[in-house]
Amino acid sequence: MKISREKWSSNFSEWFDWVISQAEIYDYGRYPVKGSGVWMPYGFKIRQNVTTLIRKLLDETGHEEVLFPLLIPETLLKKEAEHIKGFEKEVFWVTHGGEDELEERFALRPTSEVAITLMESLWIKGYSQLPRKFYQIVSVFRYETKATRPMIRVRELSTFKEAHTVHETFEDAARQVDEAVEIYSKFFDILGIPYLISRRPEWDKFAGAEYTIALDTIMPDGRALQIGTAHHLGQHFTKAMDYKVQRADGSHVHPHQTSYGISDRVIATVISINGDDHGPILPPVVAPIEGVIIPIPGKSEEDTEKINKYAMEVESVLKNSGIRVALDASEDKTPGEKYYIWELKGVPIRIEIGPRELNSGTAFLKRRDTLEGKSVKREELVKEFRNLEDQISADLRKRAWEQFKERVKRFQSLDEAKKFLENRGGIAEVPWCGQDSCGLKIEEQVQARVLGTPLKPEPSGNCVVCGKPSTNILRIAKTY
């Protein structure tokens, strides 16, 4: 069955606002603080399932969860000059306690490098304690002056997962950056989110980093969205705070650090990437409800009672197998109205129970992504349900990657790249000599943002600015 995606693709911003509101995911714009939204119960469960997944991946790789204070003293935040220079205009400051002006301002955490470095210096004294990997999932605050967008560009990032690690050598920290990228790649693969991995250019790396690796996806409107970053911090913060560890030979050295993060943008992408005009299509792994049971009334009240009883038995079978399932037995809506509501919420599988299913001892399973259905015997229900979930997950992932690859194109001229980005959107790749000056000219002439270069150099023709042989390709895109 062909499902319309016209609204989803042609007016994505309006579609997204409609979905998060009507599906009761995220209430944005009505809380009286610009750039802040409220996670509603259904949306919070999506968020919870996403954070449960990343926690599992981090815990499995030796990361330890911590929780740091929200407030950071100004003197501490300014310890690393390059870092604060990159964040200063985005910081929210607490200046008063009650009616009293504070002697020192406190920042609402924009990120936690300096705060965590301080505590690492108190906890970790020698090589035998290294490496050490910490993470937390918290709110961070950024004073966004541009137009805000729910989950994508907000002043309070309420689902900020930041990991911070400390190492004896530069090389060990570099390996940790590689591990971070592997963790994120696995995370996004499970969620069915396609991505490109790029090394950010020098002028756009994280403030206080040696280098930054980023993962970007493409949203339905053709704009690229940064969904994960990993930074090699070198010794910038440990030198700024004069933090040293003892080595095996008795000497002392400033340790090397990394940090890497994801945010609410991941949830925005999960909601958006496989949507259609009916609403989102949630992958089973993060769907609050994997299956919804809709009883279809019979011709008589007695038949309807039997159908409802059978629907409750089906619910019990699925729940006892660990499947997140809901039974919509509400009497004030028709089956068609219920279909609309649960499709809008993105529930992966609908289970229809009517007179036919009651008489044959079956259930009718309908996929949210294709709206195709099949009848299954009750004794095979759990197995068939799980198989269908696996198929849905695989098909969503395949479709998302196919859409993504169609929107990544390589060009030999800036004019072609600019035309592509203006007409279709996506990510354009052009030959680049490696000089910052040429990279900045590309940004200026195309009026788009440079995302960076592939991790393995891919020389291709001559630089589109100066004409010299390229050392790599440069990825450019319209962004949020």
From Swiss-Prot:
The keyword Protein biosynthesis applies. One of its GO terms (biological process) is prolyl-tRNA aminoacylation. It is found in: Cytoplasm. It is an enzyme of class 6 (ligase). CDD domains: ProRS_anticodon_zinc (cd00862), ProRS_core_arch_euk (cd00778). Its main location: cytoplasm. Keywords: Aminoacyl-tRNA synthetase, ATP-binding, Cytoplasm, Ligase, Nucleotide-binding, Protein biosynthesis. One of its GO terms (cellular component) is cytoplasm. Its EC number is 6.1.1.15. Coiled coil: none annotated. GO terms for molecular function: ATP binding; proline-tRNA ligase activity. InterPro entries: aa-tRNA-synt_IIb, aa-tRNA-synth_II, aa-tRNA-synth_II/BPL/LPL, Anticodon-bd, Anticodon-bd_dom_sf, Pro-tRNA-ligase_IIa, Pro-tRNA-ligase_IIa_arc-type, Pro-tRNA_ligase_II_C. It catalyses: tRNA(Pro) + L-proline + ATP = L-prolyl-tRNA(Pro) + AMP + diphosphate. It holds the Pfam family HGTP_anticodon. Consists of three domains: the N-terminal catalytic domain, the anticodon-binding domain and the C-terminal extension. Catalyzes the attachment of proline to tRNA(Pro) in a two-step reaction: proline is first activated by ATP to form Pro-AMP and then transferred to the acceptor end of tRNA(Pro). Homodimer. Belongs to the class-II aminoacyl-tRNA synthetase family. ProS type 3 subfamily. This is Proline--tRNA ligase. The gene is proS.
